[in-house]
Amino acid sequence: MNGYMAGVARAAAETFAFPEPILEIGSLQVDGAGGIGELRGMFPGKKYIGVDMRPGPGVDSVESVEALPRPDKSVGSVIALSVFEHVEHFWRGFEEVQRTLRPDGLLLVSVPFNFHIHNYPYDYWRFTPDAFRSLLREMPTKIIGQQGPKKRPLMVWALAAGPKYPTITEAQHVQFRTLIKQYAKQPMRWKRKITYGLGRLICGKGPFAPYFEAETFESHLERVA
């Protein structure tokens, strides 16, 4: 997870009610992340369970998202940021998330699109907004978002609500967007900014757009009639 998605998670936590228990999939705090991935503190006082395929800091239980050892409809909220690119059979993982999530539950999920290979321990997939629409088609209300240029986003995310979750309003969507602008940051280091700036002058802006537009985003509130 990058700092930008941590900001999106904070914006979501301050805008929407996350029912308990909250299950974070991929909660291992990776060395060198500087605490960016520590989401537990965004939900004070709530029952929060961190699971990962490996033990370590931030992990309460070692579990595979492809076969969660949890009863049907037993989880209030699921958070899975920058996880499913590492899941070999990702469709099984999405099925497990939706199996264990209660009808009044909430899911926050993100996956990179334009991002380097990062093996934790393996890196298999990239996703588009349409992929989330397909994978989450059973969840009637969704906010689909993406970071960076429309054609080559850095990250793609979705906030999806179960059929009995309180109606997500356009006013909440507007507040969510406002807080994303406030919290979600991905500044470019000055050396890289100079290097990419020269490259943009020589090659055109297209190849470098994801980096110069990293703090731009778009999102859409979608409902199934």
Predicted regions span which residues?
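Class I SAM-dependent methyltransferase Rossmann-like catalytic core
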Residues: 1-16
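Exposed alpha-helical structural elements
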Residues: 4-8, 38, 175
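Conserved SAM-binding loop
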Residues: 16-118, 128-130
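S-adenosyl-L-methionine-dependent methyltransferase catalytic module, highlighting the catalytic core
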Residues: 88-225
